[in-house]
Amino acid sequence: MAKRGVSRREFIKATGAGALATGLGANIIVPGRAHAAKKTLKILQWVHFVPAYDEWFNKKYIKEWGEKNDTEVTVDNIGIAGLSARAAGEISAQKGHDLFLYNWPPPTVEEQTVDMKDVVQECERKFGKPIDLAIKSTYNPKTKKYFAFSPSFTPDPVNYRQDLFGQVGMPKGPASWDDVRQGGAKIKKQFGNPVGIGLAQEIDTAMAMRTIMYAHGSHEQDPDGNLTLDSKQTLEAIKFVKALFEETMTPEVFTWDASSNNRAMIAGKISVALNAISITRTAEKQDPEISKKIQLTKALKGPVRAIGLEHVMDCYVIWKFAENIEGAKKFLIDYVSNFRTAFLAGEFYDFPCYQKTVPDLAKLIANDPKAHPPDKYKVLEDVLNWATNVGYPGYSNAAIDEIYNTWVLNVMFAKAASGAASPEEALSEAEAACKRIFGKWKDKGLV
């Protein structure tokens, strides 16, 4: 996606503003002349990458829930690139939606959100403990607060062209990052299809670069939230990405947005992409022939481990200034209770953070009549063994969030890959930026 014109941090400077005064006149009810106003619940979330999900959620689910709970529920959908600015605007005005969905952990807005501890506890009572990925993405161990609630996440498998990799001796696709480098170079040379991993200021690049870092044993922080970016392992990851770009890719990746790899893969232009199953689902509908050629594999092995990130972490927040806090909490608990329906409506895009809500998940993804072949999505059955959170091996804290949303690591890798800076220079610049960011949030007491 394009670089945001105004960062979340810049907007948050305005959060000291008090709640807007509300006139009383509209709330006066004359006995015998009017009924109590119907409750309302206002939700904002992204335009889902699987349109069938929005069709179900917007036109069916919220209406049914509203009728059962005597509440008028409305939902506003905006593109993922606009979420941060919209959230910052609501915080600045101290007015907006009751439920706001981020597609990544949002710890920088913790001071503006309601603690979700009771929602987590109720869902845990009903469905057992949430997955560790959900806790690491929504809980602050420093303040002991759940600043958000995550009902689901999206796996981030490797999408690859099976026909092309088969012709360079890898019929089951790449199993390691070195396979991508070697196989990708051969494919580009023989067939002209480059590797399609972004090096731009957008979310897919942010996830892919961290995946490569973590596989190399490099991390932004340690388990206790101490900065650890400046390491031999990070330098090796940067050098690897530089070589990967030079040997397998094309300069267009420097200007990609979050959907560029989707479009390029479906158009038959690239050999590999790291993305959710939105690529394969779209291909099934738009081009069944290319769909048969695109297959999935698990997280790739690096020098240290095989690991991948979540592609989307669904994190709902309830603002402290929300008008229907209790209704918003009940909506989330009920949504988790109905998550199997959501899982099916989203065509397996969103996986449950409470695993008992979809007890037959493995069976469902192992035999999908829409897929080519029907067991294409079976590869995701053990996703929790290789998927992790932004900020691994620590929590997704406020410093990690700011580093993520200001594209510090994206820029680090892009500068080195393009030759704008040496790997050492790019790392030094990123380390300096991260030190400032960690220092700021430690001073605020949130890290």
Predicted features and spans:
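Hinge/lid segment of periplasmic solute-binding proteins
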Residues: Y102-P157, T211, K293-L300, K376-V383
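Extracytoplasmic/periplasmic solute-binding protein
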Residues: K142-P151, D156, R181-L227, Q233, ...
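C-terminal lobe and pocket-closing loops
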Residues: S278-S291, G302-W407, G445-L446
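Short, polar/charged alpha-helical segment
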Residues: V50-E72, L409
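Extracytoplasmic "Venus flytrap"/periplasmic binding protein-like
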Residues: K39, K63-I131, D163-A175, A264, ...
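N-terminal export signals
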Residues: R4, E10-P31
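Extracytoplasmic "Venus flytrap"
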Residues: L41-N58, T154, D204, Y395-D401
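Glycine-centered hinge/linker elements that transmit conformational signals in sensory
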Residues: G183-K186, D224-F254, A299
